[in-house]
Regions:
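Solvent-exposed, acidic/polar segments of extracytosolic/periplasmic ligand-binding ectodomains
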Residues: 30, 361-431
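Hydrophobic h-region of N-terminal signal peptides that target proteins for export
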Residues: 16-25
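Extracytoplasmic ligand/sensor domains, especially the bilobed periplasmic-binding protein
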Residues: 52, 92, 107-215, 262-288
């Protein structure tokens, strides 16, 4: 009997020791679930590059290879454990996947979301579950303009600056549009982008005529009728915030029919299709990258390290905005957690680290970023625009004739909605 009890006791102790080993191991990691497009038309030029940027930066963080001040291994001293899910499927599906990551997979942080529709759906659930959530890319200003959140942050600026800078670029270059057409995807991102650009044009170029407004369905892929309508209207400037596979298709179809020869075109967020289109990318197109990313990135140690090393690792010729956006989000986490430990000497709870995230300023491969809006939950940064050209030596499409705009020049002050700020004549802007 005693022998049997001894064996049971020994077995129990082994199981108990394994439990503590597992628990200890779990405490040495920070677990992150990430949603990005892994399939469909938004994947190849946007979702996958975002994944690559995050993978590269998290791996570099784990190995302590990021330049100072990020050169200590891990986030808050913990190894980063991360996985990806597919953002394809719509907002309802993403809400379900979000709950699964939080309630079943027990993540410490949720990150990601490219679609503005998804970004409008996720925050309420994050607040309900008290889950720290980092929105990486989506551009609609409505996220923090229409509500306030405790557990949600957005590390990328919203779309207003893309379009304000677009109008300012025209003014700086002496381009005075008389007739403008627009083609934007028919959901929050496209609608908000066009409203911001149209409002900015009204201020800088009063009297300009809007001759065609096209809102094709997201992921439509075919734009023959929209292109025909714009060509008939004969605009001297075309605005588009389209992105991903939609933008690739529009450019190829429009170029074939001479759209880019007859009108100046402004693509507010178009840099990410330059690698895939290559020689098929028309020259002379004004292009933004939702910030100073890729060819538009500043000449800093961190920016150059990131661009050189990720290009080498992936065997690519240029970086694009989704890669930079992923890196920005990863470094935001590291800066906040590291700062919390530096001041408190213990790994912070979610409630504690939020205090360090609010209003945070951090350096990125795209220059400094500031949590300046949304009660310290919405980032702003500088903006840059360039013009497409073919580089014969590098054999790639690139951006030249670059203009930079300070963050305070193209982003509204705290507490003011972007469109209201635009309509009010950009009061308080610092250009």
């Amino acid at each position: 009997m005693e022998k049997k009890l001894y064996k049971l006791k020994k077995k129990f102790l082994i199981i108990l020791s394994l439990f503590f080993i597992h628990s200890s191991y779990g405490k040495d990691e920070i677990k992150i679930g990430i949603s990005t497009f892994l399939s469909g038309g938004a994947a190849s030029s946007f979702g996958i590059p975002l994944k690559q940027g995050l993978e590269f930066m998290f791996n570099a963080i784990n190995e302590g290879k990021v330049p100072a001040p990020y050169n200590t291994p891990g986030i808050g001293g913990k190894k980063v454990s991360f996985f990806f899910i597919d953002e394809a499927g719509g907002a309802t599906k993403q809400v379900s996947e979000f709950r699964n990551m939080v309630q079943r997979q027990k993540v410490d942080v949720v990150m990601g979301y490219i679609s503005s529709g998804d970004c409008l759906a996720i925050p309420a659930v994050a607040e309900e579950l008290k889950q720290l959530t980092i929105l990486i890319d989506c551009g609609t200003p409505r996220v923090f303009e229409d509500a306030s959140y405790k557990y949600v942050f957005r590390t990328g600026p919203h779309a207003a600056m893309d379009n304000i800078a677009g109008a300012l670029y025209l003014k700086r270059k002496g381009i005075t549009p008389k007739k403008i057409a627009a083609i934007n995807q028919n959901y929050a991102w496209g609608q908000d982008s066009w409203a911001d650009f149209k409002g900015s044009i009204d201020i800088f170029f009063p009297g300009t005529s809007i001759v065609s407004e096209q809102f094709p369905k997201f992921l439509s892929g075919q734009y023959g009728s929209e292109i025909s309508a714009m060509m008939v209207a004969k605009p001297d400037l075309i605005h588009s915030s389209m992105w991903g596979g939609d933008l690739e298709s529009f450019i190829i179809q429009g170029a074939t029919r001479g759209l880019f020869r007859n009108s100046k075109v402004f693509l507010s967020a178009g840099d990410h299709v330059l690698p895939s289109l290559g020689r098929n990318m028309p020259e002379g197109v004004i292009v933004g990258a939702r910030g100073p990313h890729g060819d538009l990135a500043p000449d800093t140690e961190l920016a150059n390290w990131f661009k050189e090393n990720i290009k080498k690792e992936l065997g690519i010729k240029m970086t694009t905005q989704p890669m930079h956006k992923g890196a920005m989000a990863a470094l935001f986490l590291k800066k906040a957690y590291d700062q919390a430990i530096k001041e408190n000497s213990v790994f912070p709870s979610t409630e504690d680290v939020i205090k360090f995230m609010e209003g945070l300023t951090w350096d990125t491969p795209s220059g400094p970023a500031y949590m300046a809006l949304g009660n310290g939950h919405q980032a702003i940064q500088a903006m840059a625009l360039g013009v497409t050209a073919w580089d014969k030596k590098e054999k790639r499409a690139k951006l030249i004739d670059i203009e930079y705009f300070k963050a305070e020049c193209v982003n509204p002050p705290e507490g003011i909605k972007a469109l209201d700020w635009i309509k009010g004549g950009f009061k308080g802007s610092n250009c």
